[in-house]
Amino acid sequence: MKVLVIADPMASFKTYKDTTYVMMREMAKRGWQLFHTLSGELSVQQGLVTAQAAPFEFLGAKSDDDHEWFKAADKVQTTLKDFDAVIMRTDPPFDMQYLYATQFLTLAEQQGAKVFNSGQAMRDFNEKLAILNFSQFTAPTLVTTRSADVRAFLKEHGDIIIKPLDGMGGMGIFRLTEKDPNIGSILETLMQLDSRTIMAQRYIPEIVHGDKRILIIGGEVVPYALARIPQNGETRGNLAAGGRGVAQELSERDREIAETLAPELKRRGILLAGLDVIGRNLTEVNVTSPTGFQEIMKQKNFDVAAMFADAVEAWSKQ
């Protein structure tokens, strides 16, 4: 297979934990021809979606800080429909440049390209707002641009989490209680004087046991979750915010949530999704560049990367 991976610069990968790295390793092991490009190197020329893509050889990292784990050749201008699969792995934020990239990908799909996840799905499934489609699994939630609404929501629930709709890695997430002396300044900063839409959710105390990432690949649920456990005194479990990742078997509730969402995600062309679950509550649906492969693979000896490559191969033939 000939595969294009759209991702951040490969030299920036933290190979000891990066999910895209093990995806590439598995695909290289299968003898697939690999190319890399940046989302900013997509363009439309004479009506066709093209990319400045570099073919590369996967060498493998010799240490955690080895940034020479690949050998790239000169970039070539290639149309996306000439690949067997195009895998979008660019990290958020989902800004205007990201939006344009998804529109290019949708056009490429119309021209015959097989894109995972689909451009349309990434536009439709904002990682925070997507949970509103599955309210039976969520804690009380508010989405608003008005700080007065947030204050009323805080008064109702007493202890809440607020977060931007376009963040990642726990950035911009605050916990508020009624006695917090900084409520005003936090809301002004995050909501930019009622000009920025945010999400508020009732605080879920089970966060101390971990914010679980549940992976769904090709409509199938990975049998292990990655519980991201916050540091002492921290409310964010994100690994980027210092959380500790512990792989564990899915609970009955985890499986209920995942198996309910899996068919809908598959229907929408989402080959890979990462559900975030705290306690019994769904908090996010990640579809841009879900992570957690390496921790599950190392701790549970379950080959998530192979499951992903199998799904890419199967879906690319549909």
Each PLM stretch: what is its role?
Residues 9, 91-93, 165-167, 290:
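Short glycine-rich anion-binding loops that position phosphate/pyrophosphate groups of nucleotides
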Residues 28, 109, 154-155, 266:
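Anion (oxyanion) recognition and catalysis
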Residues 119-123, 228-230, 278-281:
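Short glycine-enriched loops at secondary-structure junctions
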Residues 6-7, 13-16, 233, 249-318:
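ATP-dependent carboxylate activation and anion-phosphoryl transfer catalytic cores
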Residues 1-4:
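Extreme N-terminal starter segment of soluble prokaryotic enzymes
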Residues 11-29, 35-143:
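Conserved N-proximal alpha/beta basic substrate-recognition cap immediately N-terminal to
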Residues 19-20, 147-148, 155-159, 169-257, ...:
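Phosphate-binding site of ATP-dependent enzymes
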